[in-house]
C-alpha cells in the first residue's frame, strides 16, 4: 500500500444524553500509512503453514492413510527439516506453544509482530508491559492531566463559530506538519468556545453507567480499552499501531505550529482515559457506522486506532519521548520511508529490535548468559548452548559418511569438504583453492607480504633524495611527484594503501601541504598487514633460539619446544602433546577413526598429509624433484634421503660392494648379505665376531640408547616393542608365530607386519587349505608350501629355501663351520 496523505473525517454520534451540537464537535482524523514493512519476512509464511497444519480436518482426506500422509506433508512445509536445524525446529515448536499459552489480550498483539524466536516474543511482551506501567504511573502521579490536556492553556474566552470544519479546511502548512509529525487518529473539535469545551469535558467525564473516581481506574480502563480494540482492527490499522510502537516515541507538534482560534484537538486516548469504557463499548455496538460528510461512506467506530500518545498544543510543545532512551539509539525517520534501529557506535542498521539488542552487547560488553558449570558468560544464548555441549559431551551433528560427530553445525559443513574434496575458497592471485575460509585468509596474507616487500625494495631505490630539500619546488610539483609514484604502484597491481604510495615522498608532501595522513584507504580487507608491521617483519621473536614469527600464537607454540610444556593430555593413555592438533590426531589411535579416505581405492588415513602422500601413488605424481639430477620423488622425506647422495658426507661405505650409506646402522643391516665372507674383528667390543645377525644387533645396541629395561632380568632394549616381546619369555604367554614359517622365534619383517595388523582381519584366504592371512604377501609365501617353490638359494652350498628366515638360519651354520 502506497503511503498517502489522505485523511478520513468521521463523525461520532454521542449517546442520547448529549446534544446534537456536541455531536457536531467530534471529528476523527485518520492517517493511512504503509502496512507492508513486515512483508518479506519468513515468519508470516511459516504462520500460514502452521495454521494449515493445525486446522487440517480428517474429512478433507480420502482415508486414514491419505490423512496421515497429508499431515506429514503439511508438517514438513511448516518445519522445513531440509533447511532448518534441530535447534531451529525446537525453537519454532517452543515459540508456538508459548504463543498459545499467552493471555488472550496479548496473543493477538504479539502474533501481529511475527516474532521469529521466543526471545523476540518476550521482548515484545516486556515492551508492552513497560509502556502500560508508564501510563499507570503517569496518570497516578498527575491526576489533573486529563482536564489540562483537553483544554489548550493558551485559549481565550472568545466566542468561536459553532460550525464543524473538516480537516481539509485547515491551512496547508499546518495540515502537512500534522501529517508528518502525528501518526495518530485525532479527535478534532473545531469552533468551540472555551466555556463550551469545558462543558464538553465535564460531560464526557460524567456520562456513562459509572463515573471514574480514581486515577488508577482510569489507567486500567485505558489498558483494557486498548487490548479490546486491538482484536477488532483490520490489517492496515494494526500495522499503523505497530509502526507507532516501533517508533517508540510520542507524537509532537512542530515548534513553529500555532493553532488557529476555534481549533481544539485531543487524541482518542484522552477520550478513553476520561470517558467510561462501557460508554465507548456500548456506543461501538449500537452504532455500526457513521456517515462521512464529504464522501457519504459508512465507517465503523472501530476504525479509530487507539493510541497512548497525547497530541500537544501550541502552548506547551513537548519533544518526543522514546521508551528506550539512550545516546546509542538512532532511528530512521518516516521521511526516509524506512523503519528500524541504527547503532550509534558503528552505524549498522537493523530491522528487528531483537537483532539490534544482540548487536548492542558487542559494544557494551554485556554477557547475560552464564554457564552454571564453569561460570563463562556469553552475549547470545546460542553460544551458551554450544558451550554447554562441552560439559555434557553432546555432539548432535553427525557425519553420515564416516560417523564423526560435532558440537556445531558449521564444523560439520567444513568436515564434509574432506570427503567431497571441495575447495570453494579460491585465491584470485594464484588460483589456489582451499577448503576453509581461514586457510584462504592466511594464504592471502602471504601475497600481501610479498607485495609489501616489492614496494619496500622499490622505495629504497627511489627515495634516497628527500624532495623537501629540493629548492624551488612548488606544491604542485610535490603533488605531481606523489601522483607519479602512486601510478607506478597501481601499474604493478598494488593496493591503494600500500606503504610505497604513502612512503617518504607521500609523508613529506602531506606535511608540506598540511594534509592529514589518516586518509589512507585500503582496497582489500587484508591490507591491514601493511599497516600492522613493515614489509617482511616478524615482530614476535623467541628469546631462546632467536627464531621470529609473524603471529604471537605461533611464538607461544614454539616456546613449548624449549620449555617442554605439553598442556594437551590424552585421558586414555596419559600421553601429552604441545599442540591440540597433535592430541586430536592421537585420539584417533584409540577410537580407530580414519576420516581421510582415498576415493580411488578406499584406503583411509588418520592424518590428512598421509592421504596426500598416498594419492601420489595413483597419480604417479612426483612433485619433489632433485635440482642436481632431476630425479623426482613422491615424498619429501625420500627427496631428503636422495639429496645426501649429492652431499660430501659419504663416510659409511660397504667395503665389499662399495655401496654408500649415510647411517652406520643401515650399513650393518646391509652387511648381512655378505655373511658368507670371512669374519672380521669387531672394533667396538674388541672381540672377534662373524658378520651375522648377533654382531649386528649388538653393535646397534652399543650405538643406540636403550631406555627400555626389563624389571625381571634387567635387560635393556632400544624399542618398547622389543621389551614387550621380551616380557613373553618370563610369562606363560605364547609368542605369536609367523604365518609363513610357523616359527615363534622368527624375527623376519613378516612377523612384525603380522603383529601390527589386526588378527581378525584376515581377508586373504588360501584356496588349498582354507587358511587366512592378513596380508597378501603372506598368502603368496604360504602358497610356496603347496607349490614347493624355493626361490631363495645359498651361495655357499646351493641349497634352496622357501623363506628368508630359513635362509638366515642356514647361513649361521656355515659361519660355525668356517675356520
From Swiss-Prot:
Picking any one GO molecular function of the record gives: DNA binding
Basic and acidic residues compositional bias: what residue ranges?
240-249, 329-340
Q: Where, per UniProt, does this protein localize?
A: Nucleus
Locate the region Disordered: 236-263, 283-340
Query: Which keywords has UniProt assigned to this entry?
Result: DNA-binding, Isopeptide bond, Metal-binding, Nucleus, Repeat, Transcription, Transcription regulation, Ubl conjugation, Zinc, Zinc-finger
List, for all copies, the residue spans of the domain called SCAN box.
Answer: 51-132
Gene3D superfamilies given in the database record: 6.10.140.140, Classic Zinc Finger, DNA breaking-rejoining enzymes
Signal peptide span: none
- Protein name per the record: Zinc finger protein with KRAB and SCAN domains 5
The major lineage groups are:
Eukaryota, Metazoa, Chordata, Craniata, Vertebrata
